[in-house]
Amino acid sequence: MAALRVALVGIGKIAVDQHVPALRGSADWELACTVSRKGTVDGVQAFADMASMLEARPDVQVVSLALPPMPRFVAAEAALKSGRHVLLEKPPGATLAEVHALQALAAERGLTLFATWHSRMAHAVFPAKAWLADKTITRAHITWREDVRKWHPGQDWVFEPGGMGVFDPGINALSILTEILPAAVHLQSAELEFPANRQTPIAARLAFSGNVTADFDWRQEGPQTWDIEVETTAGRLDLRMGGNVLEIDGQPAGGQNTIMGEYPALYARMAKLIAAGQSDVDLAPMVHVADALTLGRRVIVDDFFF
């Protein structure tokens, strides 16, 4: 089968670090062009806006959106209306309603819409889900602590309305949680820490039904922590390295100590969805974030500056 031609929109850090290597490493894909106000990729045709690209490149079959959440709906809608399949970087939108609208539009046009959760593609997530499938969960806890200055250097949009703040990484943990637990949980309470000079939280503590809790923090320097621990009546499971390393009862049980397999797996999944004429839009992780911002008790903390 001929490679699918894709336009990559939003050439920032995540596009350069993850999307471009994944596309260039796959026979399923051809990075046909990019769209970005500033960023470019060497050797690839570049456009400054979506309208110009859509008009000039009718041969592009797929649009992959690595834009921040706020401008993503307009770009996704334009791509779908022009007959292109669409891949959405996480989170899939700034609001739940706009993603539902995109889902309806894709279905109406017979196009594939893939709302991606890259952390679900981590090496140990599937075996963790399989191990937990017949277990009785007694407790689960997420510790997701990283350094915003490392992962979003100078990117003030993450602290603007719609940027999600610490839920930008935290939603990755929630995407794993909602994938591996054998039964659904719902949020019961939350405490959110907002820097006095910012619009979104820099830390969050969440409590769910089923004795499930989470601790998110964007101020951790040095080694980063992306762990999920699950206790059951039959033993303990730990996911480390963002879902890439699995331990059962404290012993290594699979996975790989790298995050570089997630995006190749996303694009492989997208190619299969297009071939099958299907879409994949699961908003469960985003529902938990929306609930946290609805239920959360606000705590003001020190100003934050990059």
Where are these regions (language model features)?
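Rossmann-like dinucleotide-binding domain that binds NAD(P)(H)
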Residues: 153-225, 287-288
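NAD(P)-dinucleotide binding in Rossmann-like oxidoreductases
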Residues: 194-199, 209-272, 278-283
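C-terminal helix-rich "cap/oligomerization" subdomain common to oxidoreductases
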Residues: 1, 52, 62-65, 269-306
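Receiver (REC) domain switch-region micro-motif
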Residues: 63, 140, 212
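A contiguous active-site-proximal alpha/beta segment in oxidoreductase catalytic domains
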Residues: 93-151
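Beta-loop-alpha module in the N-terminal Rossmann-like domain of NAD(P)-dependent dehydrogenases
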Residues: 44-103
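Hydrophobic residues in well-ordered beta-strands that form the structural core
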Residues: 88-89, 113-115, 239
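N-terminal Rossmann-like dinucleotide-binding module
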Residues: 1-42, 306
